[in-house]
Curated annotation (Swiss-Prot):
This is E3 SUMO-protein ligase nse2. GO terms for molecular function: SUMO ligase activity; zinc ion binding. Belongs to the NSE2 family. Its EC number is 2.3.2.-. It holds the Pfam family zf-Nse. Pathway: Protein modification; protein sumoylation. Zn(2+) binds at C195, H197, C214, C219. Acts as an E3 ligase mediating SUMO/Smt3 attachment to other proteins. Acts in a DNA repair pathway for removal of UV-induced DNA damage that is distinct from classical nucleotide excision repair and in repair of ionizing radiation damage. Functions in homologous recombination repair of DNA double strand breaks and in recovery of stalled replication forks. Plays a critical role in meiosis. It is an enzyme of class 2 (transferase). The gene is nse2. Autosumoylated. GO terms for cellular component: cytosol; nucleus; Smc5-Smc6 complex. GO terms for biological process: double-strand break repair via homologous recombination; meiotic cell cycle; protein sumoylation. It is found in: Nucleus.
Amino acid sequence: MSEAQLKTSLEALSQNLLPGNQNHCSFDFQLKEIDDSIKQVIKCALVAAEIKNNECLDMLDSGIRELLDAKQRLLLMQQSVDTLANKTSENISDFENKSLLDIYTQIFKELIQEYEEKSDYGKYGTQGEYIEFKKTIWHEQNTDGSDFPSMKTFFNVMNTEEQEADEVMVYSATFDNRCPLTLQPIVHPILSTACNHFYEKDAILSLLNPTCVCPVVGCEARLQRSLLKEDEILERRLRRAQEISNLKEA
């Protein structure tokens, strides 16, 4: 197989996998479809938790896991193409009597087998989308501001190396709905993806120039506009916390 033939074969193999393609089989299209579906599942989970429909929550849990599996398969397909391209560029003579498709298939099988052998915690416990899914349900079911537990709680993980990779997603036991800048209840929250602290939107944006240190005492995270995002679930949680506070004061 000549170098030109090899290059042509690789391009054909990656046509429907690599980012940038516009057809419905492209990597970008499929990944976007999965991400959009995951967002819808999380929104449905909020409603299901609110009306205490546990059967629906179980179905949504299974659904989001299937979507995350599908997303991982896509990413591993892309990784397989990248690995194949690297291998061929290193030593083209190794591919004289081998089919690129067979080699690609073998690489993909090894990667997918490694993924499938992981525990449920290993597959989902540190995935941002699954953590958000569990957070959404937890905060709707625990409006008193209880700590969001370690993700290993949802998988019955005990003293394994996987615990070391657990996401740190703990909120204060006393849920403080006041902005660290205005010291007033937050009405329009914006969340820092750098440290998970949140603030009144206008207050923190006025502090950026173009960056600033997180105003929460003891936090040294440096903020910039691209690290701040609006979060409708957080806004809902803050609103519920304020409603509970008003009832207690009445």
